[in-house]
Regions:
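C-terminal membrane-solvent junction of multi-pass transporters and transport-like membrane proteins
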Residues: 351-413
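Membrane-interface loop-to-helix entry segments
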Residues: 135-163, 339-351, 370-378
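Hydrophobic alpha-helical segments and their helix-loop junctions in multi-pass secondary transporters
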Residues: 93, 97, 153-180, 197-198, ...
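Membrane-water interface regions at transmembrane-helix termini and the short interhelical loops
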Residues: 62-71, 127-148, 213-216, 325-338, ...
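Hydrophobic transmembrane alpha-helices that form the core helical bundles
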Residues: 31, 78-113, 289-306
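Selective recognition of specific alpha-helical transmembrane segments in multi-pass small-molecule
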Residues: 53, 57, 151-163, 227-252, ...
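TM-loop-TM module centered on a large, flexible mid-protein loop between adjacent transmembrane helices
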Residues: 69-76, 240-290, 341
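Hydrophobic, membrane-embedded alpha-helices of multi-pass small-molecule transporters
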Residues: 11-21, 162-169, 178-244, 280-288, ...
C-alpha cells in the first residue's frame, strides 16, 4: 500500500481540522465550561462523545463506503440522491456558508463599527478570497493545513496561555442547574447540537482529492489516509475543545453574566489583553470561519460537479460563493428559520447511517437500512414540524431531542428480522 510521510499525514489532519473548526466550534466549548463549572470535566467527556466522536465516525464511515452517496445508497439510490442534495444545500449555501461571513463580521464590529455598507464590502472580500482558495480543492493541504490551521491553533494557544499565566478566577464556579445532576448527559446534548457529523460525511471527498494530489492513487491507500486524517483531526479537536472549555469554566466564574460562548471569550480576551484581546479574538474567528467557508464551498462545489459534470467546478464554486454572499446580507434570518428544521430532520438519519455502517455483516442488508432510516426519518420530520412537535416530544427521550432513538431501534429490529 502506498504510504505518505508523517509530515504529509499531519498536514492532512490539520486540513480536515481546519474545515471542521468554525465559529460554532469556538463558541460551544466555552459556553459548556461556563455552564458546567465544577462539573466541567464529566460534561466535557459527554460533549466529546457527540461533538468529536460522531464527526470522526462520519469520516471513517464515508471512507469505508467509498463516498457519502455510496453510503446513503444502501437505503436506495433515489434516497441517496435526494438526501445528499438536501444535506449539501443545508450545510452549504442555505445556512453554514453564509453564517461564516456574518459571524466573523460580528466579531469585527466592536473594532471597526457596523453598518450595511461595511458588511456588504466585507462579505464581498470574504467570499471572493474564499472562492479563490477553493478554486483548487486539491491544494487545500497547502493553503489550510500548512498555513491557516497552524496560525489558528497558535492564536488560540495565546489566549489559553494568557489564562494559565493570569487566571481570571481561582477555581470553577458551581454548575448551572442543568449540569448539576447529569453533567455527562448534558454534555452529550451540547455536542449533538453542533451537528458536525453532517460535515464529517461531506469533507471526505475533498480530502481524497488532496490525498491524490500527494501522489496516492490506490483506493485502499486513499481510504486509510482519510481515516488517519479523521482521527488526527479528532485529536486536535479534543485538545482545542478542552482548552476552550477550561478557560470558559474559569471565565464563567469571573463573569457570571455571560450568556453565550462568544460573550465568554470576549470577556476573557478583554480581561487578559484589553483592546488587543478583541483584535486577537476577531482574528481567531476570522480564520476559523474562513477555513470552514473554503472547505464547504469546495465540498459542495465538488459534489454538484460530479452530479452535473457539464458545469465546470469553478463555475459551481463561484455560484455557491456568490449566492452565500447575497444570503449573508439580505436573507440570512429567514434562511436560518427554514434550514434549521431541515437540518434537525436530516441529522438523525445521518447518525443512523453512520451507526449502521459499523454494525456486523449480518446487519448489512438493505432491509435493515430501509426500515431503520425510514422510521428515523418519519420521527425526525414530525419533530421538525410545529404542529406535530408536541406529540413527538412525548416519546421516550423526545424532550431531549432524541425521540428518534426508539423508532430507530425498532426499525433495526424489524429490518434484521425481515427475510
Amino acid at each position: 500500500m502506498q504510504k505518505l510521510p508523517v509530515k504529509q499525514r499531519l498536514l492532512l489532519g490539520f486540513t480536515l481540522f481546519s474545515m471542521f473548526f468554525g465559529a460554532g466550534n469556538l463558541i460551544f466549548p466555552p459556553h459548556l465550561g461556563a455552564q458546567a463549572g465544577s462539573n466541567f470535566w464529566p460534561a466535557f467527556a459527554g460533549f466529546a462523545v457527540s461533538a468529536i466522536g460522531l464527526p470522526v465516525a462520519g469520516v471513517v464511515a464515508v471512507a469505508r463506503a467509498g463516498g457519502f452517496d455510496q453510503l446513503a445508497s444502501r437505503v436506495h439510490p433515489k434516497f441517496s440522491l435526494v438526501f445528499t442534495i438536501l444535506v449539501y444545500l443545508s450545510i452549504g449555501p442555505c445556512l453554514a456558508i453564509p453564517r461564516t461571513a456574518s459571524t466573523s463580521f460580528e466579531m469585527l464590529v466592536p473594532l471597526v463599527g457596523g453598518g450595511r455598507g461595511l458588511q456588504l464590502g466585507y462579505s464581498i472580500v470574504f467570499f471572493a478570497a474564499a472562492f479563490l482558495v477553493a478554486l483548487h480543492p486539491e491544494k487545500l493541504t497547502d493553503r489550510l493545513g500548512r498555513v491557516l490551521c497552524p496560525a489558528l491553533i497558535a492564536l488560540i494557544f495565546v489566549l489559553f496561555a494568557g489564562c494559565l499565566l493570569h487566571p481570571v478566577a481561582a477555581q470553577y464556579s458551581p454548575p448551572a442547574a442543568a449540569y448539576a445532576r447529569l453533567p455527562a448527559f448534558e454534555g452529550i446534548l451540547g455536542g449533538y447540537q453542533t451537528m458536525d457529523a453532517l460535515a464529517g460525511l461531506n469533507f471526505g471527498a475533498v480530502l481524497a482529492l488532496n490525498i491524490q494530489a500527494l501522489g496516492v492513487t490506490e483506493e485502499n491507500a486513499i481510504r486509510q489516509n482519510t481515516i488517519r486524517a479523521g482521527f488526527l483531526a479528532g485529536g486536535l479537536l479534543l485538545v482545542i475543545y478542552a482548552m476552550l472549555g477550561h478557560v470558559g469554566a474559569l471565565t464563567g466564574a469571573a463573569a457570571p453574566d455571560c450568556t453565550t460562548g462568544a460573550e465568554v471569550l470576549s470577556a476573557l480576551a478583554s480581561a487578559l489583553f484589553g483592546r488587543a484581546g478583541q483584535l486577537l479574538l476577531a482574528a481567531i474567528f476570522l480564520i476559523a470561519c474562513f477555513n470552514t467557508c473554503v472547505g464547504l464551498i469546495s465540498c459542495v462545489g465538488q459534489y454538484f460537479h460530479t452530479l452535473l459534470p457539464r458545469i465546470p467546478y469553478p463555475a459551481l464554486a463561484g455560484f455557491f460563493a456568490a449566492a452565500s454572499m447575497l444570503i449573508s446580507n439580505i436573507g440570512l434570518a429567514g434562511i436560518i428559520r427554514l434550514s434549521t428544521p431541515v437540518l434537525g430532520a436530516l441529522y438523525p438519519a445521518a447518525i443512523v447511517l453512520i451507526a449502521l455502517s459499523f454494525l456486523p455483516k449480518a446487519f448489512q442488508k438493505r432491509s435493515v437500512y430501509v426500515c431503520t432510516v425510514a422510521l428515523t426519518a418519519v420521527q425526525s420530520v414530525l419533530a421538525a414540524l410545529p404542529f406535530t412537535a408536541a406529540f413527538v416530544t412525548a416519546l421516550p427521550l423526545g424532550s431531549y431531542g432524541f425521540g428518534w432513538v426508539v423508532p430507530a431501534a425498532a426499525g433495526l429490529l424489524v429490518g434484521f428480522l425481515f427475510p
